[in-house]
Amino acid sequence: MKSFLIAIVIAVLLPVSAADFCAQWRLSKAGKYIIYNNLWNQNTATSGSQCTGVDKVSGSTVAWHTSYSWAGAPTQVKSYSNAALVFTKKQIKNIKTIPTTMKYSYSYSGTLIADVAYDLFTSSTASGSNEYEIMIWLAAYGGAGPISSTGKAIATVTINSNSFKLYKGPNGSTTVYSFVATKTITNFSADLLDFFTYLVKTQAFPSSQYLTTLEAGTEPFTGSNAKMTVSSYSAAVN
């Protein structure tokens, strides 16, 4: 009985799920991250499903994966399974560094339309609604494209030795900036503050904005037997 009770306590405290989770809004706490399945737009698919799981937590690093098949509405994102950092919200001007690393692989059958991207949101107050969204696309598979007012990049910029095309467009009342890598990056290491510094200098981005959300994951449009495996991910806001 004693060993049984100990096993229950361990199971309750263990931050990593033993199995994949497939429900639309399921999540799993993993160290200083929350791993979301986040099938926010699944109803646009004619068929499909997606499951996500945590593989390992080691210090400030997490390994996780997500698997899916989605059909229909090839211009519509179906989900954004991601690892979200839990952090204290700060104004951009008061942040010293936002170091991050992500190493991943992607497999699929047939044709895939998807991206792999960081997603960061800011607001004029720590608890306010989203005013700006900054996306950093490491990969754009099958012609996936970002939100854009014109369909054309407004600039090409090199940050941390990686080349990105910058797009701008509205998503409701939120202004979206998307840095799309010109070549697929599967092993990424950067200070994300450099992207904000660029926007402050060239796009009149207000440094008084609070960083409220920092996530990294994948947005599938369509795909069959697809799987993204993140072997190592870390992020911090200093």
Curated annotation (Swiss-Prot):
Glycosylation sites recorded in the entry for this protein: N171, N187
Keyword Mitochondrion belongs to the record: no
Effect recorded for Q76A: Affects the binding to host GIP2 and relieves GIP2 inhibition of XEG1-induced sugar elevation
Keyword Hydrolase appears in the UniProt entry: yes
Effect of N43A: Affects the binding to host GIP2 and relieves GIP2 inhibition of XEG1-induced sugar elevation
Active site: E133, E219
Self-association state and partner proteins as the record states: Interacts with host apoplastic glucanase inhibitor GIP2.
Name the record gives this protein: Inactive glycoside hydrolase XLP1
UniProt lineage: Eukaryota, Sar, Stramenopiles, Oomycota, Peronosporales
Gene: XLP1
